[in-house]
Amino acid sequence: MPPSAAASEPLRVVAAVIADGSRVLACRRGPGKDAAGRWEFPGGKVEAGETPEEALEREIREELGVPIRVGALLDRTTTIVGTRAIDLACYAAALTGAVPESSTDHDLLRWVEPGDLDALDWADADRPVLRVLGAS
């Protein structure tokens, strides 16, 4: 594939909206990361040969050190960030083990009520799913 074609392909990314009662887990990007200081739902890139669900389970295990059960697709959007298109699929997810206390990619984890999600400075690609979750 020519380099120009590869650059035009959207980056396939998945994210988990992990619920604990009415609250959801928000994660702040750590220093030195793309979008440092901004909030996102945890997840990451889909690797070749993975389904989105497999990628999400792997990414959460790697970043948060906990297993999850992936549920329904909540939202899928493509957002232009800089010169790159991000194809983000957000899934409902449930913890199947311990509650995460730290992350390899984030400097802060916070459980947030849906009505309070808008108070956080979200990464651009994560903003569309906020409507689905009832943020204003």
Tell what function each PLM region has.
Residues 2-25, 45, 76:
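Conserved N-terminal beta-strand and adjoining loop/helix that marks the start
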Residues 92, 101-133:
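NUDIX/MutT-family hydrolases
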Residues 23-62, 66:
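Conserved Nudix-box catalytic region and its N-terminal flanking loop in Nudix hydrolases
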Residues 16, 41, 109, 113:
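Residue-level signal for inorganic ion chemistry
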Residues 67, 77-100, 110-114:
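Active-site-adjacent beta-strand/loop module that shapes the phosphate/pyrophosphate-binding cleft
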Residues 16, 73, 90-91:
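A structural signal for short, well-ordered beta-strand segments
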